[in-house]
A protein has these predicted regions:
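The feature marks the mature, well-folded catalytic cores of soluble enzymes
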Residues: 1-151
Length: 151
């Protein structure tokens, strides 16, 4: 008999789009629980009732090694939901607002993974999208403290 693979946590996020919410299938979650040893489930889906969203890996760039969560705040990356996740998962949040120009209008970038990714030794970041100097400096400082080369 095989031993189940240990998975520390299963994260259920709050999603803006109704059709994406339907993809959250509890029958699959139950199968996962049988095949993997899941220590806990972090369920943030209840935020949907309050129109508060945190859309998972699009919203958050996780530096798992250093337990830091980088997030560009937007309608799809809410600070309250983000702080709830960080408190439960024991991550330190680094937040900022990131902007892009679309059809002549300046809009928030709604997913952090549009402007940032992180690896063991480096981070690719479009720093120009962070207009607030203090927020940009906090992000740079965090990456430098964790010895990430900024590309």
């Amino acid at each position: 008999m095989h031993q189940p693979i240990l998975v520390a946590a299963l994260l259920l996020v709050s999603l803006v789009l109704e059709n994406r919410r339907k993809e959250r299938r509890f029958d699959i979650i139950e199968k996962l629980k049988k095949q993997f040893e899941i220590k806990r489930v972090i369920d943030l889906s209840y935020f949907e009732k309050e129109s508060v969203f945190l859309e998972g890996t699009g919203s958050m760039i996780l530096d798992r090694q250093n337990k830091i969560c980088y997030a560009a705040l937007s309608d799809r990356t809410n600070l309250i939901a983000l702080n709830d996740f960080c408190n439960r998962a024991l991550y330190n949040p680094v937040t900022f607002k990131s902007y892009q120009k679309v059809e002549g209008k300046i809009n928030l970038i709604y997913h952090t993974n549009v402007m940032m990714c992180i690896a063991d030794q480096y981070a690719i970041v479009c720093l120009e999208t962070i207009h607030n100097t203090k927020e940009r400096e906090v992000l740079i400082s965090s990456l430098e403290k964790t010895n990430k080369e900024i590309i």
